[in-house]
Amino acid sequence: MSLKNSLNDPQHKFHRRIIVGFLNTLYKNLPKKELPESINSIIIIAQEKLGDAILLLPFLKALNDRFPGIAIDLCCTSYNRKIFEGISFIRNCVSYRPYNLRFSKLIRSEQYDVLYNPKSGPSSTFHHITNKVNANVKVCLNDSYNNPIYNVHLPNDNKKHIAEKYCELLNNYGLSSPIENWLPKYFYEFPSTINDGEYVALKMSAGHQSRKYPYEKWKTIISHILQNSNMKVALFCSKKETKDAQKLKTIFKEKIHYPLNSPDLYHASGIINESVLLISLDTSLIHLAAALQKPIIGLYSNDILNYTRYKPYNVLSKNVKSSSEHIRDIDPKNVIENFDQMINNITKSST
């Protein structure tokens, strides 16, 4: 994905800046303040994407460890609420999208020590929430559009991994990098539905069209795995790749596990956790596998900034970057070479 694409549609981002800039003329601009010496209560606004939600988990764990007994309220979309709502130390987990009465009551009734918005850029939704919340200190990552309605503007280094950027608040309270990956215990409560030998988990698809990888190239990679190891392949795919997955199942028969019994992220976690490694161009599963401490081969575009921010965090990985903005231009030979090296490393470490 090019820098242009990685910014989630420049035209949309431009419109978002226009809206946030207009809101800054309506909302009260806040004076700069110091962070409190200790935090007793905090409300955090979580980003919309699944991968971003997974990357926020290490921060939440570190926050609770640093301030035992802290009251943590977390706002998220209904889409990724299941990731957070079972965490025992989160007091309230409420959806801000779609907007609802429970969320409205919460942000109007509570008084927090700190509001924290860890999003790198502007969001009209986050701006509206921030303006409504009662907090002694409102904290964001430094951004000229965000800054006017926040008291504290933390460093916003785009060369940092997103997991570490989320932890900028805790850097002021003695946290050091790299931060430890973490998943709530319920991610480990769903065993793999595959129980007939070793397998490689492989995610064929991702959300954006520029991240699509051709069927014939997947076929070449899968054929190599099956011919040069005793492992099978467990296929994850979206509805758009269903026909491709079915064709692979027809060709390789019982050596392909598809369809998978993974109706949600928890079941997918069980399958990935018991795999030998993950091959994926979907960063959501890459971040999940990293949190599970599974070896990863990730497929990325030539967008170095995007790679730096969303590569597998703090885990054994070999990643393949395209020569262009499109993942489809990756030569399958490069993936195969990295797979062979990864298997050799895993074999050596286990002997």
Q: What are these model-predicted stretches?
A:
Residues M1-T351:
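Catalytic machinery of carbohydrate-active enzymes
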